[in-house]
Amino acid sequence: MENKHELFPGTAGKFNYVYACYLTGHWIIGIALLIFAMLSVPFEAYGAFAQNIGLPPEPKVSEQLQRALDRIVAKNLKKQSNLASSQVHLAVIDLTNPQQPRLAQYNGREPVYPSSVIKMVYMGYVYHLAKQGVLEITPKVRKKLYQMIHPSSNTATAWIVDLWSQTSGVEQRSPREYKEFSRRRNACNRWLRSLGITQINACQKTWGSPIPPGEKQFLRNGKPSGPWVNRNTMTAVAAARFLQLLAQNALVDKKSCDAMRKLMVRDVRNQSYQRMRIAGGTPKGSKVCSKTGTTSDTFHDAGIVTLPNGRTFILTIFITGSYRGPFIRNVSKDLYAYFMKQMS
């Protein structure tokens, strides 16, 4: 099990020796050990540590925005007789003042299965690794990223997960082999933790076909049988924070964030299925960068919305169950009206 209190994973023992030398006054030995310890830190750990420096402020709950969101949700739930309040998970971050972001949420801290929304996280991790020099965004990788985000290909997603984890989940593994497999597949989660995001589990492929034995083993967290306790999960608040970092060019660097947002741009004129999602509720002249997710029991969207006047907000709406109505679109439309009124 990883030591959650280590500054760099796998280095606690090394730095303890350095600290002991410091306490006993053996400065020369301590400096030598410090150099050795730093040189032997995994490259990935340096990237994680550096990534956590200078992140944008976390959003604080705004009573005013919360009251507005509660009214909007209540109004739209009344219009949907086939949608229960417990099925709705929602978060809004207002970025009007980037240094004082405001948060409101509705069941937004409850974890749900994110379906294809998780793909935006895998995209972010690939760009992070590219920035660290671990992999290269080749034309083939770029094509797979496009297929994963735009048409939301599960096949492309599986390829991307295998790329960053250097694994293949076809066959079941021995306990020793499984431990290494699990470590590799949880690399994306370690990156998220370095960003301060703890309420996302991003380690599984997205499936639209039979699941191989090795992947089932991982879904069961290594057990030979039983429930899938290791599924991908996400809260609306955590998804919104992830998108806030993307919107503020803090997820990786500006060039990478620009490329990611470009992949996520939505246009209802060319993507008719977006009419019931966030983009469907925004006026002409707005820009929406989002990732949807749909299965037999999920209907999600998570996006960055930039209004014609330049005001930006994050909106994540996860709906569980078989509902397929206009709730997401209508909430998006009402939030647009609210923010425009606030500016007048």
Question: Which residue stretches match the model-derived regions?
Answer:
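Active-site SXXK
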Residues: Y113-L135, M148, L315
